């Protein structure tokens, strides 16, 4: 099965009341761990590349890794997606370079500018059967080149979503309901809360339309504990409870983005391995267990 766009994935997810996992990839071990797990589960998957990952690992290396994953896992649908594309130029480069889905992130721009740029991306991408995601509202937190202070974060205005989707022609919409990028999503002692009222209103205004949640890592406590046990310093890392993600998936969310959990899994595994095996220096010895941690 060749790379696919997200149209059929999201149609089935919406009808089935579940969300497709979208995982940020930076290297071979992450790609292998994710796709091996999804292959065993017979689950569709979105492998997404941020502008920072593309700069770090190179467009060609990443696309070839994903192509290899497609060959190794022929029975599952795999989409290759650009995460947080800040410009038409980058989105176009990814469309031209074999991506099957792109996100234009104009959430920091004035509304009309966001509309105009998203429409431009959609018009170009659709010529090549590439699906397009856009964003309304701004998530707090840090992810590669995306830096938004808590006081600058904005919840999505449900009153804008119909106009935005109609005028841009995008295929899915990322909204801000209280998730955030990074491993510090809530303050210590703060009860995790998401604005499900906004999600409900958006889904009413856009019936059947795929919604996306960014910044949705659970920040698995086991990984944080291991990192801190072996020399790390992440005392206040808090993520999104899994039950909230399941609830969102039953309310029109068809794509849930995961990045921090992958970083935590790899870091915890590598720290533990090197602490317990101080004489080892072959990267395969510690990256192999890290790959397994990603898969598990």
Where are these regions (language model features)?
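Flexible, glycine/charged-enriched surface loops at secondary-structure junctions
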Residues: 78, 128-135, 279-288
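C-terminal alpha-helical cap/extension of soluble enzyme domains
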Residues: 229-232, 240-296
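Generic N-terminal amphipathic, Lys/Arg-enriched alpha-helix
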Residues: 5-21, 280-285
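Alpha/beta enzyme core
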Residues: 4-12, 27-53, 59-75, 84-210, ...
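Gly/Ser/Thr-rich loops at beta-strand to alpha-helix junctions
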Residues: 217-219
